[in-house]
């Protein structure tokens, strides 16, 4: 894959100007189960192992229809190669029954949990990819630093 980003001059820093040369996108996958594991896991028992693939394969997954259920995951630290311009979380989801639900991306930094206000509607049996871009740490409101990523948990919540 190529690393690319587009800054269109709108919004807040750092996404409103040229970011400079020498940056790259680092993909991280869950490395262990986080503080919350409310969702059902197949085949089990480790929640993170069911979602640590870069592409879904329908043999391992977590699922829930219960509003408020939260599943969090720890991630390994990225390589120390310069500043962090943002964090982007990708989630692939679909419904397996007939009940539509809203899916929210959740970030836990230290002891504070933050989720999207509205979330995204999951109402299709085909996989949909939901992306949440966070140029700033939504818990602190300032630019990401390495310590933020080292102590980060990210996951999903039924809205």
Task: Report the location of each language-model feature.
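Disulfide-rich extracellular domains of secreted proteins
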Residues: 1-159
């Amino acid at each position: 894959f190529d690393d690319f980003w587009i800054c269109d001059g709108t919004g807040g820093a750092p996404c409103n100007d040229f970011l400079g040369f020498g940056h790259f996108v680092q993909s991280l996958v869950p490395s262990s189960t986080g503080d919350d594991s409310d969702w059902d896991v197949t085949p089990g028992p480790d929640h993170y192992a069911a979602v640590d693939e870069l592409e879904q394969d329908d043999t391992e997954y977590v699922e829930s229809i219960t509003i408020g259920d939260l599943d969090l995951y720890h991630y390994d630290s990225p390589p120390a190669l310069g500043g962090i311009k943002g964090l982007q979380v990708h989630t692939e989801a679909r419904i397996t029954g007939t009940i539509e639900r809203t899916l929210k991306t959740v970030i836990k930094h230290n002891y504070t949990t933050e989720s999207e206000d509205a979330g995204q509607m999951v109402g299709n049996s085909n996989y949909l990819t939901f992306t949440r871009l966070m140029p700033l740490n939504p818990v602190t409101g300032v630019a990401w630093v390495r310590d933020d990523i080292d102590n980060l948990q990210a996951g999903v919540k039924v809205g």
